[in-house]
Amino acid sequence: MSDADSPAPILSPDREDGTIEDFTRIEDLADHVDETVTLKGWLHNQRGSGGIKFLILRDGSGFVQCVVPQDAVDADSWAVADDVRQEAALEITGSVSADERAPGGYELQVDAVERIGESGDYPVTPKEHGIDFLMEHRHLWLRSESQWAVMRIRNRIETAIHEFFQERGFLQTDAPILTGNAVEGTSTLFDLDYFDDENAYLTQSGQLHGEAMAMAYGKVYTFGPTFRAEKSATRRHLTEFWMIEPEMAFYDLEMNAQLAEDFVAHIVQAVLEDCEEELEALDRDTSALEQVETPFPRISYDEAVELLRSDETAEMIDERIEALNEEKAELLEEKEENQTRRGQAKKHVKRKIDAREIEINKRVDEIEEALRNLPDWKESAQTFEWGEDFGGDDETVLTWHFDRPVIVHRFPAEIKAFYMKRDPDDDRLAMGVDVLAPEGYGEIIGGGERATDLDFLKEQIEAHDLPEDVFDWYLDLRKFGSVPHSGFGLGLERTVSWITGRDHVRETIPFPRTIARLHP
């Protein structure tokens, strides 16, 4: 076959600059001021009238205002801009200009607008929606600015996690998702039929396998999904969530605690440095995050119980109740004044008043819920008995005493897992360590020093009514070069919830799985 008869190449060889994309990302506009660029994305919102339109375009990397004067574009472009609907896909070409007033600090003076994909009646409009509606439309709600910001921060947290461990010589390893044994108790296992009539379970934790890998590689961490068939409908619980679990050979409890606090501080600092725009989009008060410096306060379980039952805690809760009642009264007074003003107001003022009323109603609902809960939390704290595990409400109250995460250590052995080492100075206690996030968010890390005594572990497996044969491989770790070792697990979604200021973990993972939700 002659060259003339050869088919045209499928791929263009013209990639001397190494680029793949033939368009510009919104996050890169700072590099193109006074240049003409082409953007591709979706219409987030719009406004304007007469001979000018303001289109807010989003592309996953950010948001930008595109200014479309009718006299600066051709008829086809104006027809698109004048009739475009929310979430239509667009290609927009124009000149980049810096403008501090615009979203992201830049805007596009448009030369041309082309529709790539039409949008129908988009259900998730800018108005207020109930949480059930939003969760039913989670696949679309993810496109909103708030959810964009949460997922961008989640991504930065994930990259910060890998940075932290890789810089410290850890090996990332992978634990199995299908297991033949329980880790955190049999009552929360998702079980399924395996081959040859054997039972298998979705993993509750990668910790046991992490211990095996720590004995092979020294310092390891796993990063994967975990599953708990726990019928809890609280703001902190999911049935499927992601855990980061380091395991370290030759680490004792104190070394473990120091690593945990350095880890949390590193994550927070990474988000503060790199996610300013996203935190602002969420209206997150960063003053509390800026307090996250090591060392963290440390209290024993015994001291935590004393603090819960103290007069100081009772007075603190009473003061919160009083402050919330005052805030509620002020908000209701403002709402009444706004309703009086609204009757004589112009249309644009009415829109502002209506938007403010939505904010007031939402905050009043939050206050009323808190006022219903706080008396119960006070009673729970005042009557807390030694030997009980801290509930979410107890953790919330404890964190109100501190301006940064607090480390709680040495728990009653009965409330900790079978593999936890006992305190050599008090056999009632396990060498556990938890990290509680401030601002009422509670536990984000749980861990401790692992038991190394073979006979003790056998006794604990029997005491917890677990089948020893499925733990034979785990017990082998104590027979061949057993050493002191420790580890912990950080719940990714709880950490994202705290750092982003979300009230519920369901907003911190793209498609949450709860006891009430398996779709979308």
Predicted region positions:
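Class II aminoacyl-tRNA synthetase catalytic cores and aaRS-like
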Residues: 1-520
